[in-house]
Amino acid sequence: MSLSDVNFKKKLLIVVPYRNRDQQLKIFQYHTKIYFNEDKLDKHLNVKLCILEQANDKPFNYGRLCNAGFLINEDYLDYIVINNVDFLPMIADYSYSDSPMLLIKHGHNNLPMRPSSNSKWIVKGSKRENFFGNSVLLPKHIF
C-alpha cells in the first residue's frame, strides 16, 4: 500500500463559515464541486463540505463556527480544512498531512498571505490582525 492510497482513504472535512455572503457562497460551492470532481489528484479524496452560516446580528464569530463544524462532524473526519468563503480551491494539495498547512498562499493582487490575515484591509494593531482565515489544513489530532 502506497502513501497515496492511505491519503485517499482519509476523510477530509472542509468547513466554510460565513454570514451575509450569499453570492460568494454560490460561487464557492459551484467551484468546489467542479474542483474536487475534475481535478486530477483531488478527485479521489473523500471530501465532505460543511457550510456554516451565522444568522444573528451579533459580531461574526468565525472561530465558533469552525468549532461547531468540527464538533458536528468529529466522527466523520480525519483532517479538516478551514476555508474562507472568499478563497476558492485552486492549485493546492488537499491530501492528508500530519502538520498544519496553509493551502492558499496568495490572495488579492497575488500578494503573499499568512494564516493570520485574510484581507488586504487589515490594519496593524486591530483586533483582526490575529484573525485565523484563508484556507488552512489541520489534522484532527491538532484541531
Each model region followed by its residue ranges:
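Non-catalytic membrane-proximal stalk/linker segments that position and tether the catalytic domains
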Residues: M1-V6
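A conserved hydrophobic helix/loop-capping motif in glycosyltransferases and polysaccharide synthases
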Residues: L13-R21
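Short acidic, S/G/P-rich loop/turn micro-motifs used as interaction or catalytic elements
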Residues: N20-Q23, F87-P89
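Short, well-formed alpha-helical segments that are part of the catalytic scaffolds
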Residues: R21-F36
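Active-site-proximal specificity loops/subdomain of glycosyltransferases
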Residues: K26, E38-L77
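Conserved catalytic core of nucleotide-sugar-dependent glycosyltransferases
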Residues: D57, N61-C66, F70, Y79-N83, ...
